């Protein structure tokens, strides 16, 4: 009897495995952290074999822990850190280099060179939906081919394969039989034409990347292959769903309709809006990406990210030592009625969308003699909501629609003061679901739909339940005054590092 879906959630700092039942209850979770490698300033790597070992380890652990049998697992769904790049030998399975992680800035020089070709920059934006940036996979592959001895020659002979983390996991789970990715992960490589749904020859040629390295692009929900979960029974379990982490969170939040939006409050914030079958080109520095691909049809999304979201709370705790526990920020922030005119702009590494200012730096503005610890803590929390509002306003303008409801998840979404302020400052209802494991849940949904475990998106949406909702409760005049203060503070922080 098929009773469960196993979701593999391969993140930037840890690998997790979660078991869901048909009612979307979580039966068990296993998690294992793995090594972050920093060979040079601004470089970030992972060992691909350690990614695999940690992911396979938690898969076996969660099955043992929950005492379920392989026969009871209907399917496996995969969600993953996006853009991270792995190149390996297709005969031996040995990686030729460490995985180059999405955060890694080593290819910034290659990007600057490419940007000199204005026509090419425009072509990339128009056809991949992305801005030329070291964040995406394309220049990471080029770097490996150019810098690892013999790599280019081997790639041209068809001996090397490229994959994002989803591709690597499926390849390992199927013992090297299956080399695939899904539409969402392909859309983050900067090599995939999201209008025509194909690898883009012009970009491949410009970067000198052999097409033979690339995986086949499949739906986000279909059976890609089978794996044996390591028992003696030899039961073959289908691997049936796959999408990048932010797209999975959008799907896990049941944002199936055009115009629906979710915000994940993690270290940074990731805001995605489903734009349906329309690919919208942002005029506000957002990227266009594929939200999901099912039955050969894709839905698109607009995506914006805040570099420093929950990380501002860590800064308050670890560097300023204003609290000993991140959860205490709510308690102290509530001790004051408002921010007392204080604004924190956490531009520690510059500002992302819609500003895109790499030279902005963090600052605290509006201090008076009466400003105290609580005002600074409150202003830090509010900065997360202001930055999210900046993105929401940009999205509304690009999509030509008004947001009435924002679905939220991620660690900082548990902070009630922050969520209430988010509702107040955006004028939209903010909704937190009962299951906040939305990324893994999205992967489970995709896999479950492919094998008939759940019959339809409608069945899934019916089971999606609200834990708490926050309605806007701030006078328009007060809202405008607060936001105007934020805009003024950002203006002062911009361009700080420039000579």
Curated annotation (Swiss-Prot):
Keyword Lyase among record annotations: no
CDD domains found in the cross-reference section: FGGY_EcGK_like (cd07786)
Keyword rRNA-binding: no
Positions annotated to bind sn-glycerol 3-phosphate: 12, 82-83, 135, 245
Chemical reaction(s) catalysed: glycerol + ATP = sn-glycerol 3-phosphate + ADP + H(+)
Annotated positions binding ATP: 12-14, 267, 310, 314, 411
UniProt GO BP: glycerol catabolic process; glycerol metabolic process; glycerol-3-phosphate metabolic process
Binding site for ADP: 12, 16, 267, 310, 411, 415
EC assignment: 2.7.1.30
InterPro entries per record: ATPase_NBD, Carb_kinase_FGGY, Carb_kinase_FGGY_CS, FGGY_C, FGGY_N, Glycerol_kin
Pathway given in the UniProt record: Polyol metabolism; glycerol degradation via glycerol kinase pathway; sn-glycerol 3-phosphate from glycerol: step 1/1
UniProt activity-regulation remark: Activated by phosphorylation and inhibited by fructose 1,6-bisphosphate (FBP).
Gene Ontology, cellular component aspect: cytosol
Binding site for glycerol: 82-83, 135, 245-246
Class of the enzyme per the UniProt entry, highest EC level: transferase
Record's keyword terms, sorted: ATP-binding, Glycerol metabolism, Kinase, Nucleotide-binding, Transferase
GO MF, one annotated term: glycerol kinase activity
Xref: HAMAP family: Glycerol_kin
Annotated PANTHER family: GLYCEROL KINASE, SUGAR KINASE
Family: Belongs to the FGGY kinase family.
Subunit structure: Homotetramer and homodimer (in equilibrium).
Function per UniProt: Key enzyme in the regulation of glycerol uptake and metabolism. Catalyzes the phosphorylation of glycerol to yield sn-glycerol 3-phosphate.
Protein's name in the database: Glycerol kinase
Source organism (scientific name): Clostridium beijerinckii (strain ATCC 51743 / NCIMB 8052) (Clostridium acetobutylicum)
Lineage, broadest ranks: Bacteria, Bacillati, Bacillota, Clostridia, Eubacteriales
């Amino acid at each position: 009897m098929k009773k469960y879906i196993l979701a593999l959630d391969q993140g930037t700092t840890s690998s997790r495995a979660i078991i869901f039942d048909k009612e979307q209850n979580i039966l068990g979770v296993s998690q294992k952290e793995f090594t972050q490698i920093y060979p040079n300033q601004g470089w970030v790597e992972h060992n691909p074999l350690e990614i695999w070992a940690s992911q396979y380890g938690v898969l076996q652990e969660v099955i043992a822990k929950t005492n379920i049998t392989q026969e009871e697992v209907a399917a496996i769904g995969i969600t993953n850190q996006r853009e991270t790049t792995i190149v390996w030998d297709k005969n031996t399975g040995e990686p030729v280099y460490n995985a180059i992680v999405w955060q890694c800035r080593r290819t910034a020089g290659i990007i600057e060179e490419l940007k000199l070709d204005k026509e090419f920059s425009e072509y990339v934006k128009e056809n991949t939906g992305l801005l030329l940036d070291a964040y995406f996979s394309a220049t990471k592959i080029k770097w490996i081919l150019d810098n690892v001895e013999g790599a280019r020659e081997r790639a041209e002979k068809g001996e090397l394969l490229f994959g994002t983390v989803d591709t690597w996991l499926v390849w390992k789970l199927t013992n090297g039989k299956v080399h695939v990715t899904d539409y969402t992960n392909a859309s983050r490589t900067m090599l995939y034409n999201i209008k025509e749904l194909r690898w883009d020859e012009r970009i491949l040629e410009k970067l000198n990347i052999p097409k033979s390295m690339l995986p086949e692009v499949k739906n986000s929900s279909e059976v890609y292959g089978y794996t044996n979960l390591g028992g003696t029974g030899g039961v073959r379990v289908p691997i049936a769903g796959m999408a990048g982490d932010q797209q999975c969170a959008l799907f896990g939040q049941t944002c199936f309709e055009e115009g629906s939006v979710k915000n994940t409050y993690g270290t940074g914030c990731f805001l995605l809006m489903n734009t349906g079958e329309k690919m919208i080109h942002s005029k506000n520095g957002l990227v266009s990406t594929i939200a999901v691909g099912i039955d050969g049809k894709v839905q698109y999304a607009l995506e914006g990210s805040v570099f420093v979201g929950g990380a501002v709370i860590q800064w308050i705790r670890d560097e300023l030592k204003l609290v000993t526990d991140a959860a205490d920020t709510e308690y102290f922030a509530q001790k004051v009625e408002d921010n007392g005119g204080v604004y924190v702009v956490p531009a520690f590494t510059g500002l992302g969308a819609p500003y895109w200012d790499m030279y902005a730096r963090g600052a605290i503005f509006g201090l008076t003699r009466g400003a105290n610890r609580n005002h600074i803590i409150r202003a830090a929390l509010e900065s997360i909501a202001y930055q999210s509002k900046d993105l929401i306003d940009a999205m509304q303008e690009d999509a030509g629609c008004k947001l009435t409801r924002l679905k939220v998840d991620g660690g900082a979404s548990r902070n009630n003061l922050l969520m209430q302020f988010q509702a107040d400052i955006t004028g939209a209802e903010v909704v937190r679901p009962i299951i906040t494991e939305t990324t893994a849940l999205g992967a489970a949904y995709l896999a479950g739909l492919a094998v008939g475990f759940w019959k339809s998106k409608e069945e899934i949406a019916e089971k999606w339940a609200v834990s708490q909702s926050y309605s806007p409760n701030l006078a328009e005049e007060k809202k405008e005054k607060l936001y105007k203060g934020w805009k003024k503070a950002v203006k002062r922080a911009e361009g700080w590092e420039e000579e």
